[in-house]
């Protein structure tokens, strides 16, 4: 009996020891699992760590910190190119200069497919998004009428559109322009014209203006600009501070407008003020002298008093400032290339349009302008690009389609 009792005790002890061993191993496994795969109590106040996304400004700051001074200045240049295709020479130019963008012109515009391919190839050869811009106002300035096979929608003059005083129609015309341009990959247009047609003998502006009433011009400009931008093309409001009251063509010589600050506020500046109030992103400064503002005959495009003091400080504009084309007679007949480049940047310009020599522009700006001033413009340019330049090309069927023609037919042509 005693032997049986002892045996029973031993067996029970062994069973208990085995059970304890199994429990110990399970507990150890559970602890290891907790360490490797923590379980978050959904009822607690603890939140999982958030993934912090890089802001556009942070991205731009990083890019600028990694750029050479030459690359920074390249971002301040928009190039006039004469190629029909992006050949090895042009690829090397883009690699060397790293320009901010190109202005599409009659030299680049051939067939629809070739022009589209040219623009695609420009973009593919640039690490930073390119501004692909064009003069496509309507009336006598619409470069896409040079397409050899499929014409863009023909837009009547802005003076004809202005006579309707129909801001909704102006918006729709902006949409038509935008959709045509997006079929090719264009993203910026040098329109609308904000000049008030106050001099009936002004042939250089003439019917490019919406009219002689500054408030009508303001309303039509802003509405057309909104039609452009709501449909993927960034508008450029031009030619600050106003090219409407002169008979001189700045393509050949320097216009001089003798108007006081008060006179400009009550006329020429009204459309630009309204554009600024409605978030204008680019304003083009014209090659026009206003001696009552500057006490000399310096063109507005080279004047700190007009660009920094008037446009930025007085009117509160903080968007991009671009020059009119730098190969125009108003400048090149009065200044050297070196003076043009340096004076424009000193005045407050961010982007130089069509410098005649990009390498020279980079050299003289590097030698005469502080890094801080260059960085100021480059940061604005890059923030603009990464915010607004979207690769949203439309199908070719949008070009000059039936709906576009129906909209344009509402503009009475005189």
Residue ranges and their predicted role:
Residues 74-86, 158-171, 253-267, 327-335:
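Active-site mouth loops of central-metabolism enzymes
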Residues 91-105, 175-188:
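Catalytic domains of carbohydrate-active enzymes, especially glycoside hydrolases
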Residues 156-186, 191-221, 225, 229:
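A substrate-binding/cap region within the structured catalytic cores of diverse enzymes
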Residues 78, 103, 189-190, 236, ...:
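Conserved beta-strand positions in the central sheet of alpha/beta enzyme cores
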Residues 68, 108-124, 130, 140-142, ...:
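Second-shell residues forming the walls of enzyme active-site clefts
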Residues 2-97, 149, 313-314, 334-414:
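Preference for extracellular/luminal or secreted protein segments
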Residues 81-85, 134-147, 187-197, 237-243, ...:
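Short glycine-enriched loops at secondary-structure junctions
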Residues 109-131, 165-185, 379:
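Active-site-adjacent structural elements in enzyme catalytic domains
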